[in-house]
Swiss-Prot record:
Lineage: Bacteria, Bacillati, Bacillota, Bacilli, Bacillales
SUPFAM superfamilies linked to this entry: Ribulose-phoshate binding barrel
Enzyme class at the top of the EC tree: lyase
Presence of the UniProt keyword rRNA-binding in the record: no
GO MF terms, alphabetically ordered: indole-3-glycerol-phosphate synthase activity; phosphoribosylanthranilate isomerase activity
Lineage: superkingdom: Bacteria
Organism in which the protein naturally occurs: Bacillus cereus (strain ZK / E33L)
Pathway where it operates: Amino-acid biosynthesis; L-tryptophan biosynthesis; L-tryptophan from chorismate: step 4/5
UniProt protein name: Indole-3-glycerol phosphate synthase
Length: 253
């Protein structure tokens, strides 16, 4: 029996095959916004996340326009949008809607395994593409990262353990994302940020922490570890006061 990640990647292969049948990438170039610039100060990347394999439905009927507008008003430095439909109940339409509403950098959060998905994300308005080391061979990761650069976009290269980190460092990417969630089991351990962050600080690389940040105390932990930003989804999608969450993010360490 495969892991959750294996199931997701199998589904992506089907989606990619369908895209090649139904989608023709546009050639026009457009203006993009920089996450690297946003990370010059500690930044919250606020996520639109309707559901997940581990939690089921989180906020299925969220008004994407309203959510994104609130994020921007509260001080988010970037917005992340889940575009996976099968497991996270997102869509490229959600990404496009966010782009229409937002003037800050926009991350396409998906399991990218092929260039055509990057083309689709670009057309929908993404500025940043997530590339997950655990979902790709070294060769494919390098190929997709090069394509991101060719499109004039930025990448977050996501890692969960030391082995994946070594692969990511070789690319010298724009941003490395430490995912505190193990994509094989979907369990979360915030100490991954502290463990892997030490190496990234030594390498003087730009990095963020992803998943598992729910409180002021969690925010202090990731800031102390040296993260330049944090990606927050579930905590914001279920929050009764997004404004209060952002105020808590302003803690000094």
């Amino acid at each position: 029996m495969g892991t959750i990640l294996d199931k997701i990647v199998d589904q992506k292969k089907k989606e990619v095959a369908a895209l090649y049948e139904t989608y023709t990438p546009v050639k026009e170039k457009r203006k993009t916004r920089s996450l690297v610039k946003a990370l010059e100060q500690f930044t919250v990347i606020a996520e639109v996340k309707r559901a997940s394999p581990s939690k089921g439905d989180i906020n299925l009927h969220v008004d994407v326009r309203k959510q994104v507008k609130t994020y921007e008003e509260c001080g988010a430095g970037a917005v992340s949008v889940l575009t996976d439909g099968q497991f996270f109940k997102g869509s490229f339409y959600d990404l496009q809607t966010a782009r229409e509403e937002s003037s800050i950098p926009l991350l396409c959060k998906d399991f990218i395994i092929d260039k055509i998905q990057i083309d689709r994300a670009y057309e929908a308005g993404a500025d940043i593409i997530l590339l997950i080391v655990a979902a790709l061979t070294k060769e494919k990761l390098k190929e997709l990262y090069s394509y991101v650069l060719e499109k004039g976009l930025e990448a977050i290269v996501e890692v969960h353990d030391e082995q994946e980190l070594e692969i990511a460092i070789q690319l010298n990417p724009h941003v490395i994302g430490i995912n505190n969630r193990n994509l094989k089991t979907f369990e979360v351990d915030l100490s991954q940020t502290e463990k892997l962050g030490k190496r990234l600080n030594e390498e003087k690389l730009l990095w963020i922490s992803e998943s598992g940040v729910h409180s002021k105390e969690d925010m202090i932990r990731v800031k102390r570890a040296g993260a330049k930003g944090v990606l927050v989804g579930e905590a914001l999608m279920t929050s009764s006061s997004i404004h209060t969450f952002f105020e808590d993010c302003k803690v000094n360490i």
